[in-house]
UniProtKB/Swiss-Prot annotation:
Recorded catalytic activity of this chain's protein: tRNA(Arg) + L-arginine + ATP = L-arginyl-tRNA(Arg) + AMP + diphosphate
Species assigned in the record: Staphylococcus aureus (strain JH9)
Pfam families: Arg_tRNA_synt_N (PF03485), DALR_1 (PF05746), tRNA-synt_1d (PF00750)
Gene3D superfamilies, per the entry: Arginyl tRNA synthetase N-terminal domain (3.30.1360.70), HUPs (3.40.50.620), Isoleucyl-tRNA Synthetase, Domain 1 (1.10.730.10)
Motif 'HIGH' region boundaries: 130-140
Single GO MF annotation: ATP binding
Subunit structure: Monomer.
Leader peptide range in chain numbering: none
Name by which UniProt lists this protein: Arginine--tRNA ligase
Entry EC no(s): 6.1.1.19
Compartments (UniProt record): Cytoplasm
Length: 553
């Protein structure tokens, strides 16, 4: 339990003890503690006096006064109490309790903010999963940034997380990839008789693959068409996936598992789920096609599994894949999908219900569109290539840290304008620079302290920390673990970037109001330990969203 929860629990226990002591109720109802909207009304407030009115048969203000008169303020860490309005009780805490967070942060280091106990739940988080047919773009970048941050947050909150990328290496798009490579392969050999398929891939990367294969494996030209296309499918996917993996690694995004769609066919899992759905009576034949009765489970219409030409829809392997996720022992399945996949939510949930799996175990987040902006105008195409701007170009333009931070700053269900000019600014108007500068500034002070012979230690006397800005800063440090738990519960990575901005702002305010290194040695030691706790917190929070914490800037 974090320090904030400990203090709240103690306050609730002491209020309950006070009610008993005052003889207000034999059975005490739930005591709710809330943080007042206006900090002038205290650190915490409760309406328990009004709740007790019918039980105690007294005026709520009288009840409130009785609670106040019988409260052990020392045990409750309370220095002042006000009764407001019809009977609200406002508590102002003795903030010395907050200083306990300093040694805790220093001792835990990189693990500060992480919960100590496992939730005992396995989470499979699938994100990015771009088709291996070209470069990653800004939409994939947002998916990667949010997905990786969410994996870090859930891990810190005590979940057992598997990060997975689903490789769409089967289906028509891979056939089109193979046909496109075939055309470029023969062109490189001087044979222009192979035309590009209607839905082919015309990128420079396909030309490069064709040239490379013509140079290294000219013997492929003598293969049968079937064997040749099989080879081009395999080599094309390998080439594109190697490039995608390299870009994602540079973007500081890593996966535990790369799951191949082809493996579902090879292991017979698609036929297995199809047979199971038929056996359970959830499929039917109509218009020469095989349908799944997803309307039985709140979908707006039934879905085709096998088309009238005998080919599978994308939905069938998707069902097999999600059933495989369940079979692997995952309690929670989280999918991060692009904006064009909104219609998938109900049908995928319905498909799980056909197997008796609670569809609430599947959570789908839709990543809304991102617009790249420069000088107030949308940038749609790369100036260098004339094509859509790639993840690699974004990294080259603004850097990994800025890209990761900006793409995690907003809720994924909201549209977002990525200001590339702001992301490159080295000023405090740039959110990531502002946060990183706070860390670098702390490192500079700690370096000066060390030069003066003042070492960071968790065993200081912290009673000298009384400045209002210092207390507010410590409150923010103490709020780190609750913020992680909240971000994990709501699957909201942007709660961490919001926290980082607030923490950096509180530090800058403290820095401007209070000198850390002074002639008062005991106070200096306490402040040095405090800002080390802030530094650890800031570094851990930045790491959670995949951003570095530089020691100098």
């Amino acid at each position: 339990m974090n320090i904030i929860d400990q203090v709240k629990q103690t306050l609730v226990e002491e209020i309950a003890a006070s009610i008993n002591k005052a003889g207000l109720a034999d059975e005490i109802p739930d005591i709710k503690i809330e943080v007042p909207k206006d900090t002038k009304n205290g650190d915490y407030a409760t309406n328990i006096a009004m709740v007790l009115t019918k039980i105690a048969k007294r005026n709520p203000r009288e009840i409130a006064q009785a609670i106040v008169d019988n409260l052990d303020t020392e045990k409750a860490h309370v220095k002042q109490i006000d009764i407001a309005g019809p009977g609200f009780i406002n508590f102002y805490l003795d903030n010395q309790y907050l200083t306990a967070i300093i040694p805790e942060a220093i001792e835990k280091g990189d693990q500060f903010g992480h919960v100590n106990e496992s939730k005992g739940q396995n989470v499979l988080l699938e994100y990015v999963s771009a088709n291996p047919t070209g470069d990653l773009h800004i939409g994939h970048a947002r998916n990667a940034a949010v997905g990786d941050a969410l994996a870090n947050i859930l891990t810190a909150a005590g979940y057992n997380v598997t990060r997975e990328y689903y490789i769409n290496d089967a289906g028509n798009q891979i056939t089109n990839l193979a046909r496109s490579i075939e055309t470029r392969f023969f062109e490189a050999l001087g044979d222009n008789s192979y035309s590009m398929p209607e839905d082919g891939y015309n990128g420079k990367d396909i030309i490069e693959i064709g040239k490379d294969l013509a140079e290294k494996h000219p013997e492929i030209k003598d293969y049968s068409e079937e064997a040749r296309l099989k080879e081009f499918r395999k080599l094309g996917v390998e080439y594109e996936m190697a490039k995608l993996k390299n870009d994602l690694a540079e973007f500081n995004t890593h996966f535990d598992n790369w799951f191949s769609e082809t493996s579902l066919y090879e292991k017979g899992e698609i036929l297995e789920v199809l047979a199971k759905m038929k056996e359970l009576g959830y499929t039917y034949e109509a218009d020469g096609a095989t349908w799944l009765r997803t309307t039985d489970f709140k979908d707006d219409k039934d879905r085709v599994l096998i088309k009238n030409d005998g080919t599978y829809t994308y939905f069938l392997p998707d069902i097999a894949y999600h059933f495989d996720k369940v079979k692997r022992g995952n309690d929670i399945l989280i999918d991060l999908f692009g904006a064009d996949h909104h219609g998938y939510i109900n049908r995928l949930k319905a498909s799980l219900e056909t197997f008796g799996v609670d569809s609430n175990r599947l959570e789908i987040q839709i990543m809304q569109m991102v617009r790249l902006m420069e000088n107030g105008k949308e940038v749609k195409m790369s100036k260098r290539t004339g094509n859509a701007i790639t993840l690699r170009e974004i990294m080259d333009e603004v850097g990994v840290d800025a890209a990761r931070y900006f793409l995690t700053m907003r809720s994924p269900d909201s549209h977002f304008d990525f200001d590339m000019e702001l992301a490159k600014e080295q000023s405090q108007d740039n959110p990531v620079y502002y946060a990183q500068y706070a860390h670098a500034r702390i490192c500079s002070i700690l370096k000066q302290a060390k030069e003066q012979g003042i070492e960071v230690t968790a065993a200081n006397d912290f009673t000298t920390i009384t400045n209002e800005k210092a207390i507010e800063l410590l409150k923010k440090v103490a709020d780190f673990e609750p913020t992680i738990e909240s971000a994990a519960e709501h699957r909201s990575a942007h709660r961490i970037t919001n926290y980082i901005q607030d923490l950096a702002a509180h530090f800058h305010k403290f820095y401007n109001a209070e000198k850390v290194l002074t002639d008062d040695i005991e106070k200096t030691k306490a402040h040095v330990a405090m800002i080390e706790a802030v530094r650890i917190t800031l570094k851990n929070a930045l790491a959670m969203v995949g951003v570095s914490a530089p020691e100098s800037m």
